[in-house]
């Protein structure tokens, strides 16, 4: 890590704290040469393997954008979307792998979204599961009701 002030490559860690529910570490550093202090954030990179085989870094923002579309016109706050995106990231990181397939992210979105707003869940599921008819919606609603009764 180079000092942002003098570009020296030696620094010492003064303080370390876990942030983002344990998914990152914030370190306060001091340059051994100029004595200026700066902060770094370390996070294990999570790559998403897309359907076409390409990879890209996981983005909470992309989760929020996709779910926001399903929540359009619904009473769902930005804070609730941010919490959902954090839950999704935590869930996919539990796989313990540095790469995850895009469809697994969709699966990780479904349950927290259902708990947040059932209409938004149905909208998202209709795209994610490629619903083709009203029968697909009816089947999903029956499945939701069965799950509700068993809980």
From Swiss-Prot:
Cofactor note: Binds 1 zinc ion.
Record GO terms (molecular function): ATP binding; DNA binding; zinc ion binding
The protein's required cofactors: Zn(2+)
InterPro entries named among the record's database cross-references: ATP-cone_dom, NrdR-like_N, RNR_NrdR-like
Domain ATP-cone: 46-136
Nucleotide-binding found in the keyword field: yes
Positions of unnamed zinc fingers: 3-34
Swiss-Prot/TrEMBL GO biological process terms: negative regulation of DNA-templated transcription
Annotated S-S bridges: none
Position of the signal peptide: none
Pfam families (UniProt xref): ATP-cone, Zn_ribbon_NrdR
Coiled coil: none
Keywords attached to this entry: ATP-binding, DNA-binding, Metal-binding, Nucleotide-binding, Repressor, Transcription, Transcription regulation, Zinc, Zinc-finger
Family statement: Belongs to the NrdR family.
Protein role: Negatively regulates transcription of bacterial ribonucleotide reductase nrd genes and operons by binding to NrdR-boxes.
Name the UniProt record assigns to this protein: Transcriptional repressor NrdR
Gene name tied to this protein: nrdR
């Amino acid at each position: 890590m180079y000092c942002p002030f003098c570009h020296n490559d030696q620094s010492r860690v003064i303080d370390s704290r876990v942030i983002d529910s344990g998914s990152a570490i914030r370190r306060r550093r001091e340059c051994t040469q100029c004595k200026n202090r700066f902060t770094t954030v370390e996070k294990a990179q999570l790559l998403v393997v897309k359907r076409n085989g390409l990879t890209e870094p996981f983005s909470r923002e992309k989760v929020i954008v996709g779910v926001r579309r399903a929540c359009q016109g619904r009473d769902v706050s930005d804070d609730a979307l941010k919490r959902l995106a954090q839950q999704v990231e935590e869930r996919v990181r539990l796989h313990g792998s540095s790469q995850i397939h895009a469809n697994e992210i969709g699966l990780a979105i479904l349950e927290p979204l259902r708990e947040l707003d059932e209409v938004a869940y149905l909208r998202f599921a209709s795209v994610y599961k490629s619903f083709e008819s009203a029968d697909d919606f009816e089947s999903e609603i029956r499945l939701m009701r069965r799950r509700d009764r068993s809980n």
